[in-house]
Amino acid sequence: MKVAIALTDQSFQRTKSMGIFNVSMGLAKGLMNCPEVTELHILGNNECGDAFKDCPPHVHVHLTDKPVPRRFARVWWDQFGLCAAVRKIKPDWVILPKGVPPFFPRFGKAKMACYVHDVMWEHYEQRSAADRKGPFPWHELLYFRNLSLRAMKISDLVLTHTQFNASRILHYVPQARIARIGIGYDDTPPAPETDSPKRDVLTYASTFPHKCTPLTLQRISAWLNTREDGKDIRIHVVGSMPEELALPNAGWIHHARIPYAELRTLLREKCRMAVYFSDYESYGMPPVECLLNGVPCVASDIPPIRENIPAQYLFNNADEADFIAKANAAYDKKSPFICPEFPTWQEVCNRCVQAMLQH
């Protein structure tokens, strides 16, 4: 089977979703080792192309001399450039890991598989206008809403991860052909620590309103105030801070976007617990990454997170006492550490290939 996968719009520095970036890269790397894929064409750029050096002979990387498309160039690539590139390759299947298909041009005879990560536009349409402000201009939200619905309707195969997200796709397009292939991880959890000297806590920040950064700072501050050792606990905040917010004091350490290898080191060497607040997720990768690095992560109790994270780590966003109780239990190791089993990227890509072969 001859497969093309489009990564030209992927950038670690510029992406608004690290989850989508990680899934895109994981799929491309995993497909290399699927025996059914006899020829793999990766449409890359001069940033993500660096991750695909020294590939096997059946893997071909294209367009690595081009920059990541942005704004109008991104729209032009989505609608015309991608189609032209795919028609030259003439694959059996083209995979769009960002889930953004063109409106009109076709890929020749190639079948199309779109990875639909979320229905986030649905969530933002339901928020009040005052609460909707964020990195989504109205025209961008409308553009991706329409392309997301088109992906659900015209894809020969819709790839996704959680049962929650699959149910939202079927709500809008009951006839969608869905393969729930999941998300892969290649980390092996370290041995459980019974008496860890680590004291730090890791949490996340974002300019996206649904990531609840103000609530995150408020709840963690309240938790610290209840503990005798609260002044000795450092809080690592990973991600982009909203402009109107400042960290409470010098005990809070801000990290901008960091590579996963650096995050992994931070978790394994310094952190005793992680905290993840969110109003909306389609999956929720950060809590899983924390567990796979041996760090309990207390997280918002919403349906997609509930599919992957043990109940002992879940709290009600609206209940401060519940958060404090769950945080204390995790930090003080009152219950045995639990890390469910998660598929590797190779297993996820095998599922993807089998689904394509069946269609």
Positions of predicted regions on the chain:
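Carbohydrate transferase catalytic cores enriched for Leloir-type hexosyltransferases
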Residues: M1-H359
